[in-house]
């Protein structure tokens, strides 16, 4: 396996699950959003404020291309990374892709106190999350090798299911 790539909506558990998978597989863990922050010295909300979403998405595309070219990495992507066809191609070519699916209720609960999510700076985050999932879900599914439900499941159980399901996949 080249890389293990996690996609899915905000609050699906990509970073938490990714860290655990990396530890289990003894691989480095990378979060594309955190890597952008490290590289720029600015947090994601600041980048959104100063450059707008298109500016952030340009940075994200460059970072995903770089990280997917690596070998032996567990990568958690931002929720909107799949919106650009270039990213979908890079992610699919970069390794095995796992779509972590979470219900809107779970997403709201997991993101409620996180101030680092510019798209959720709204009076009705559930509506925004629902709209985003409706648009993004087909793209997550398009590139996923496997889809994993994360609702009300301990991260360790999700990790074990991912490892078992990956072992069942034919080589590509």
Curated annotation (Swiss-Prot):
Pfam families hit by this protein = SKI
> Reaction catalysed?
shikimate + ATP = 3-phosphoshikimate + ADP + H(+)
Q: List the disulfide bonds.
A: none
CDD domains from the UniProt entry: SK
This protein's source sits in the domain of life called Bacteria
**Subunit comment:** Monomer.
Q: Sorted alphabetically, which InterPro entries does this protein's record hold?
A: P-loop_NTPase, Shikimate/glucono_kinase, Shikimate_kinase/TSH1, Shikimate_kinase_CS
Name of this protein: Shikimate kinase
Name its cellular compartments: Cytoplasm
Question: Cross-referenced Gene3D superfamilies, in alphabetical order?
Answer: P-loop containing nucleotide triphosphate hydrolases (3.40.50.300)
Question: What terms describe the molecular function in GO for this protein?
Answer: ATP binding; magnesium ion binding; shikimate kinase activity
Looking at its record, which EC class is this enzyme?
transferase
What family does the database annotate? Belongs to the shikimate kinase family.
Cofactor field:
Mg(2+)
EC number of this enzyme:
2.7.1.71
Originating organism: Pseudomonas syringae pv. syringae (strain B728a)
Annotated binding of substrate, by residue: 33, 57, 79, 136
- Annotated residues that bind Mg(2+) are located at 15
Where is ATP annotated to bind? 11-16, 117, 153
List the GO biological process terms.
amino acid biosynthetic process; aromatic amino acid family biosynthetic process; chorismate biosynthetic process
Keywords, ordered alphabetically: Amino-acid biosynthesis, Aromatic amino acid biosynthesis, ATP-binding, Cytoplasm, Kinase, Magnesium, Metal-binding, Nucleotide-binding, Transferase
- Cited function: Catalyzes the specific phosphorylation of the 3-hydroxyl group of shikimic acid using ATP as a cosubstrate.
- Gene of this entry: aroK
Q: State the pathway, as annotated in the record.
A: Metabolic intermediate biosynthesis; chorismate biosynthesis; chorismate from D-erythrose 4-phosphate and phosphoenolpyruvate: step 5/7
């Amino acid at each position: 396996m080249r890389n293990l790539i996690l996609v899915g909506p905000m609050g699906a558990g990509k970073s938490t699950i990714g860290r655990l998978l990396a530890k289990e597989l003894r691989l480095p863990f990378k979060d594309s959003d955190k890597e952008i922050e490290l590289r720029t010295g600015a947090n994601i909300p600041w980048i959104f404020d100063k450059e707008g979403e298109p500016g952030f998405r340009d940075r994200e595309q460059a970072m995903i291309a770089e990280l997917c070219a690596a070998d032996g990495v567990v990568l958690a992507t931002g929720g909107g990374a799949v919106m650009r066809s270039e990213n979908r191609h890079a992610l699919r070519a970069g390794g095995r892709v796992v779509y972590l699916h979470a219900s809107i209720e779970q997403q709201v609960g997991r993101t409620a106190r996180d101030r680092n999510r510019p798209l959720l700076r709204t009076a009705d985050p559930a509506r925004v999350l629902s709209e985003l999932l409706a648009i993004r879900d087909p793209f997550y599914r398009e590139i996923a090798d496997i889809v994993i439900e994360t609702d009300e499941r301990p991260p360790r159980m999700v990790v074990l299911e991912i490892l078992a399901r990956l072992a069942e996949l034919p080589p590509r």
